[in-house]
Amino acid sequence: MNSRSFIIMVERIFLSVLFVSVSCLAKGQQTPLSPVSSWVFTPYVYNPAMVGSKDFFSIGLNAAFQGNSNAQLISGDTRISKTGSGYFSSPEVSEFKNIGIGGSVFKDISGISKNIGISASFSYHVPLNVSHLSFLSFGISVKGIYNSLDNDLVGPAHSFKKTLYPDFDLGVYYYGTSFFTGLSSTNILGNPWKSDTLKIFKIPVSRQYFFTAGYKILLSKPMNIVLEPSALIFVNDSTIRKISDNINPIIKLYIEDFSFGTSFYSDGKISFFAQYRYPRIWVGVFYELPEKTAYFSKSPIVEFTLGLNLQPVKSKISNHGHW
């Protein structure tokens, strides 16, 4: 089998999986304020230092539903650039500045709680060599979140005032041609002090801490095949003393415009994900098996994502670097 036939076969398999996953979308769910698949498709949501780390403007949409719970997230990021003059007959070229910007609009309904929010992210990228192939970046996200409780579900005795509260995230991120690592914290202000009149229900927000590290291994240059082993550690204030129980190893494989992978969790869960890039458009699917249950006795998590990469038209070889 030649390389072209192999790539066509992979594309057909991905489209088949995508069709099945979309039909299951109505059974999906997301973690409030932190979509389950964001660490795969839009990692800058949990680490603002990643904003602008790619050389194109990207917009992503995540959506999932399950019963009375649902969540939607629209996010985007870009690196600020300026137009510079080319050489001789060459056209003008874009030169990237050190500043990245991004933002998101999100809504999630989980049980009796409903959150609607907006965020703005800023990052500063410091080049670590003259070739500008490795950077150390610092980022911050400022958020405004509007929270309310469904009084029809909690009853009139638990009268709850609708609350608009601020929050922010911080992050630091190193990335080069092969190795990357980052550390971030979200919802730093924690849970707002307001609650219902009987002090029973509180706004479901907690500080979250993320650490990620990974390495890209080139397996085949002619076929643009890259293997990326990595790990993600995610804890909050209540689990920060159990870091060893929250290490999630991740394996990801890139084959030209297609990527897929899997992640393993210490609590027995396992997830699969895949992404395919069309010119300027990318689609992806995320599927997580339930925790230690046999044959879907609990609903699995299924998410679908759609995005736009609004980068200048480049050669095919160059575009394969846009992951």
Show which residues each predicted segment covers.
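Subset of outer-membrane beta-barrel
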Residues: 29-323
